[in-house]
Amino acid sequence: MGLNYNQEDFMGLDRFFQDAVSHNNTDANAASSIEVEMYECDCMYPTFAEIARRSGQPEIGAMFDAIAKEEGMHAQLLTKLYSELEVKDSAETLEAKRLVSTIESQIDAVASDSRGLRRALETALEVETIESQKTYPAFAKLAAEQGNMEVATAFEAIVKSETKHANWVKRALENLLEVA
């Protein structure tokens, strides 16, 4: 499969996050969150960091590494609150992992094309914006409505972190576009 930079999304990753499932159950939302945060920590952001480094942008690579680390911390926070929760990769996460593997297999081509890093940044911005403005605020609200204030507080903390990530990525994208 060749990369098609004219696609609306970056190898389908945008679609994965737009289609993220929200449940009417705080436990299910926590499981979904752990799954997605681990995917971002272990797969998506390390790949984006490598694209940045190979594109000659080590600062952006370091930013993606920092975001990956914090996404892992989000998963750990929720895992502590839900130590008994069984988390399995959904079909959507398995598909996203397959898409990242495709990107990794073509990483030299992606990194050598200026659109590759731009699309990685655009995807990251979209992901972090969805999480900070839609997904986690809704999860926090539902947890509070269901009387689970500890989990609501955790989701609210994640909102702040995801907002910070969105701001970092937005600045990096703006800076990249200025020099392009």
Curated annotation (Swiss-Prot):
Cross-link (3-(L-phenylalan-2'-yl)-L-valine (Phe-Val)): 17-127
Domain Ferritin-like diiron: 21-180
GO CC terms, sorted: cyanelle
Subcellular localization(s) per the UniProt record: Plastid, Cyanelle
Binding site for Fe(3+) 1: 37, 40, 71, 131, 162
TM helices/strands, residue ranges: none
Signal sequence coordinates: none
Molecular-function annotations in GO: ferric iron binding; oxidoreductase activity
Keywords, ordered alphabetically: Cyanelle, Iron, Metal-binding, Plastid
UniProt xrefs under InterPro entries: Ferritin-like, Ferritin-like_diiron, Ferritin-like_SF, Rbr2/Nigerythrin, Rr_diiron-bd_dom
Residue numbers binding Fe(3+) 2: 71, 128, 162, 165
Classification via PROSITE patterns: FERRITIN_LIKE
Keyword Signal in annotation: no
Subunit relationships: Monomer.
Note: The name 'symerythrin' reflects the protein's high level of internal symmetry.
Protein name: Symerythrin
Organism: Cyanophora paradoxa
